[in-house]
Amino acid sequence: YTGWSFCTNMANVTAQQGGNLILNNFFGVLLTTAYGLANQVSGILYGFVTNFQMAFRPQIVKLYASELVDDLWELVLKASRISFYLLLFIAVPSIVNIDFFFSIWLKQVPDYSTTFCTLIIIYCLIDSIQAPLWMTIDATGKIKAYSIWLTCILVFNLPLSYIILKLGGPPSTFLVVRVVLNLITAIVRTIYMKFFIGFPIRIYCKMVLKCCVVLVISFLLSYLLKCLLDNLELSKILSVLSSLII
């Protein structure tokens, strides 16, 4: 268990830190700075939901060990939904008003910082709704096949990004590839849960679809308020409130 878990963690670190090497190689230090800024935003977002997610992890392990399958799936679905909405509460206003926040935070904003941070927020949203699933897989102790699949997908990020950038792709290529591969790992993880643990994938997909609808409506409403209101400060407040209400 420890060895396979280590492989997955190393693949995650390689996928994240490899971005610095690739961006520095193709575009220099300035875009590396923008990527570092995006990673800081990622750390803030993860810190916001991590404490909540860690609170239900022992319960997941307990329910699996007790073979209380129905209660386990109910907890996993509920935890996924709440984790997503908690992060959504700060993700939507952050994306909509990201230029405003940067103007307060930094005197000089590096190029592509807005794009990088938007993509990293999307990445974090995918992770938030998937966290209870990988916690459940960890609780089973049967992670060999899962870790092999996950490691292969995550490490594929670097060569694929390098090839696309070599062919003239934009600087955001690395993070776009990361988001797409994270989505693929989410699909693989969900399918693995279905076939090896009996996870109710149909109910989970319906829940994910509802979350996506809420995300789109929240974003559109927040963006519409931002565009319509003349008072800049008021628009920021209402953007946050609209995401909370929805």
What positions do the PLM features span?
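Helix-loop junctions and terminal segments of transmembrane helices
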Residues: A38, S42-S80, L87, W134-A139
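Membrane-interface helix-loop junctions in multi-pass transport and translocation proteins
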Residues: K144, T151-I187, K194-F195, F199-I201, ...
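Alpha-helical transmembrane segments of multi-pass membrane proteins
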Residues: V96, Q108-L133, A145-I148, V176, ...
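Interhelical loop/hinge segments that connect adjacent transmembrane helices in multipass membrane
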Residues: Y1-Q16, A55, Q59-E74, F195-L209
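Interfacial/gating helices of multi-pass transporter permease domains
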Residues: Y1, I22-G43, D71, P110-T115
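Alpha-helical transmembrane segments
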Residues: L133-G141, I191-K206
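Alpha-helical transmembrane segments of multi-pass membrane transport and lipid-handling proteins
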Residues: V49, W73-S128, V155-K166, V216-L224
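Transmembrane helix-bundle signature of multi-pass secondary active exporters and lipid flippases
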Residues: T8, N12, Y35-M54, F84-I90, ...
